[in-house]
């Protein structure tokens, strides 16, 4: 949910999440990325973005888990934080 709307597009969730991440609104960004993961659990970029949001919130062990998940899905992903 974003506001009173239920978003069902991974692309829209990611776009909004990245915007919130840039604004420093990490809680909302995390929520949006987690919603995107519910729609596509096999996208390593979603796990990486979730890790970035968690790291920004100081939730380091959870962030590492997300980065590891991203790498397990795509071991060649040089962008995985």
Describe the predicted segments one by one.
Residues 35-38, 68-72:
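Conserved structural position within tetratricopeptide repeats
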